[in-house]
């Protein structure tokens, strides 16, 4: 049993052949005792492996475009502008010497040389 769907009928026409067209999808039902509304399947022009390859290709294309955009944006953010020199680092590195204070009296050190309580 085949159910054809198509455009609404044209006013004044009752011929079923003018309602359906060649581009209209055809729905078929399986004859296993189920009601007509259950299990409608669309008749495809392609086989199942071809449809699977098409879907996987579209998914790979979308994922590839997303990865390409992420790569390009990462490369553009890394490059500093050619006219502006790179900013000096404000974070001291491990190899850099500690900053020297001009006031030696108030500078703090981690090692004490004399004890204030020792009065000999």
From Swiss-Prot:
Q: Which residue stretches does the UniProt record annotate as biased composition, category Polar residues?
A: 107-120
Organism of origin is Equus caballus
InterPro entries in the record, alphabetically? Glycophorin, Glycophorin_CS, GYPA_B
User: How is this protein positioned relative to the membrane?
Assistant: Single-pass type I membrane protein
Q: What is this protein called?
A: Glycophorin-A
> Where in the sequence does glycosylation occur per the annotation?
2, 5, 7, 13, 17-18, 20-21, 24, 28
Where do the TM regions start and end? 50-72
* Protein function: Glycophorin A is the major intrinsic membrane sialoglycoprotein of the erythrocyte. Appears to be important for the function of SLC4A1 and is required for high activity of SLC4A1. May be involved in translocation of SLC4A1 to the plasma membrane.
The record's region (Disordered) falls at 1-40, 78-120
Q: Does the keyword Glycoprotein apply?
A: yes
Tell me which family the UniProt entry assigns to this protein: Belongs to the glycophorin-A family.
Q: Which domain of life is it from?
A: Eukaryota
List localization entries.
Membrane
Residue spans of biased composition, Pro residues class: 82-100
- Chain positions with Phosphoserine modification: 119
